[in-house]
Amino acid sequence: MEKIFKLKEHGTDVRTEVTAGLTTFFAMSYILFVNPAMLAQTGMPAQGVFLATIIGAVAGTLMMAFYANLPYAQAPGMGLNAFFTYTVVFSLGYTWQEALAMVFLCGVISLIITVTKVRKMIIESIPTALKSAISAGIGVFLAYVGIKNAGFLKFSINPHTYTVAGKGADMAKASITASSSATPGLVAFNNPTVIVGLIGLAIAIFFIVKGIRGGVLLSILVTTIIAIFAGVVDLGSIDWHAASLTSSIKDLGKIFGAALGSKGLGLLFADVSRLPGVFMAILAFSLTDIFDTIGTLIGTGEKVGIIASTGDNNESKALDRALYSDLVGTSIGAIAGTSNVTTYVESAAGIGAGGRTGLTALVVAVLFAISSFFSPVVSIVPNAATAPILIIVGVMMLSNLKSVDWEDLSEAIPAFFTSIFMGFSYSITYGIAAGFLTYTLVKIIKGQAKDVHLVMWILDILFILNFISMAVF
């Protein structure tokens, strides 16, 4: 292990890395169930998507482990699978095979961007204050995800102010989009699941503040045990034979390679009238994939040594390898039959637990692979156990805001929009877009447009085009 992952050089050991890997896996294992449920709405077989999710996650995460030697895990991105289902398939009318073809092309575009060093140029073009804001923004995003997953929030929606997209009258497969009338509020703490989440948060705070070794994982385990005794997790309801590996493999055969088949790439460019929509969808896929990854790497890169505290690149070779690993996951995932694979922001939970090398990623990859045989085991760990970890890690990441000069509005305004919009829009990419656009706007107002890097001007234009496509198509 020492020879492969250079543990001593990174100030870590096997026990810490394994603990970090377990922490990251349980923080993101929800994707094993959420992704198949979401993509199945397009007509894809859920059990096949379950295996495709694992294949994409394992491929990308193993690349992170052995090629990049970094503690990042990959899996199909949540925002990306929602865009795949509700926008590309439901709203734009493409088939799931064509949507998979778009995802594959997104991987190819990412390869070109990475090989030509464009991704590295993007990172280097971002001002130090914005990098700090991106780090803090990911903290806001993580904390919000944790608070929501713990069940601490409720949302009230006024009648006739929302739209429903989904499969006919089946509300279980519907997506509800509300206007600004949707108002968040605090739940009444009288639900066992919410109470367990609150207890889990207290346990996590205790272990982490006390500096107990392996406290993050211990918090997850203790809270899970409490959830079982509280009836939040019903072991008796778990059907260990419901989804056998044999039936999953059979369903995988229906979607594996569909992206490159006659109903995928073969049809995608057949109708010239649809080309504008195709190109804009691919652009949206690519922008989101690129900036979800870049945002995560910038947000956590200082701790693992790929982004220096000055905001400049410290080990560009490791950073490049992380970016290559990401695109490999997307390409293989698309061929297997899932939406874009991206570097997971939940990796921050494992990094917070001490993960510093690819051994953390290897543990995550192995656990994903094992999940193909024992998927019910993964479902035992409730959101109430993992959500508190996301909240605490988010709090710790907010410390990056101290690097922002709040007296200088040219720094403060973009930093505010970057960090806050990540949580409010539930998207790392949209937070970055808000920061980039407001940064450029402030510079123009101050007569300092020449200080804006050329790459940022290009990205501003691409973000604006993406927002226009969202409004038009």
Question: Model features per residue range: what roles?
Answer:
Residues M1-G48, I220-L319, F463-L465:
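Helix-loop-helix hairpins and the membrane-proximal interhelical loops
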Residues E2-N35, G56, G77-Y86, F90-I138, ...:
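Helix-loop-helix junctions within the multi-pass membrane cores of secondary transporters/permeases
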Residues G11, R15, I199, F279-L283, ...:
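Alpha-helical membrane-protein architecture signal
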Residues V18, M38, I122, G214, ...:
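Residue-level signature of catalytic and energy-coupling elements of molecular machines
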Residues G43-L62:
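Loop-to-helix transition at the N-terminal end of transmembrane alpha-helices
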Residues A46-Q47, Y72, W96, I428:
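Membrane-helix interface/capping residues of multi-pass secondary transporters
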Residues G60-A73, I205-G211, A284-D292, D326-A336, ...:
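Transmembrane alpha-helix interface/packing and boundary motifs in multi-pass membrane proteins
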Residues L92-V222, F229, T360-F473:
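Membrane-embedded alpha-helical modules
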